[in-house]
Amino acid sequence: MDQNLTHRNHYIPRFYLKNWSLDGKTIQTYSILVSNSKVPYWTQQSIKNSAVWNDFYTRIEGDKEIDNFEHWFDREFETPAKPVFDKLLNGQKISYEESVVLSHFVFAQYVRTPAAYLRLTEQNIKLFPKILEETTAKINREAEKIRKGYPAFQFQKTVRESFFPMKVTVDKEQSLVEIKAVVGRGSYLDNLKHLLSSTLKVAEHHDWRVLHASEDISFPTSDDPVICLNYRNADDYDFKGGWGRKNCNILMPLSPRLILFTQVGAKGPYKDLDHSPYYSKLFRRMIIQHAHRYVYSDRPQKGMLELNARVVNAQLYEREKQEMAGWHIEQIQAERNL
């Protein structure tokens, strides 16, 4: 095994989580899924061991393991965004170019978490069977034409390299083509590469504003910190908004006192939201409700059971633990068994 591989993939950057750390090393963590009721509601965890999934981004090429996604995130998104975050936290204005860097980071963060993996995988499972069926049928029709003497159809070649685990079997005698694919880590990484290259442009023109919490509110963050919000009123909203969908609100906590906000297709300054006790309380509620498995804070927060009650389930907890532990081997085997 290559000793230079990262393996421990942080899906939330450590520099970001440190904004909720009182000592620069640890953070208060609320677990939504626990093994038994005796587990404390809040525990102090090392940032180094928070928001980590071993080999979440590791991919396979032949017999070689490659972790260039982790380095790509750091090089293309985290490192450029760090000084922009520092300016926002210090109350400084940012340039248009820095706003684009910020947009790239927030968009990347939206799609790089376990919660995003589940969203995209669910979407892939729904779409891919039909896509593969249509593609196979088209290839088979063209193969039959070739067998009858018609000229070969020139299929358009894809420009981008695909990480999608796929096997194509050709039966020359029957002029049939069979396509098999695995929907899992490989398809997710393929999604990420596409989203963070060609689709990334959709995020570049948002008018980001930094909103302040009211004095009595402290914003937490979570393991799924970017919220795409369809908001109708305080009792009627959902988290299924889109980056290019007009009037969708996009939020991301920056610190216990600050939250990043934009509305697609609109311009700020959103003065009625800034320092507002009403909206600060509402944003805090949304952050907690949107969490996948963990809420992070600088100190234990009250009212968690009302907003996102933890699930006490030993079997489910153990199953998820085992799935994460066996994730890498299972994904490798699935791809090699194609």
Please place each PLM-identified region on the residue numbering.
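Alpha-helical structural context detector biased toward long hydrophobic helices
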Residues: 1-8, 14-338
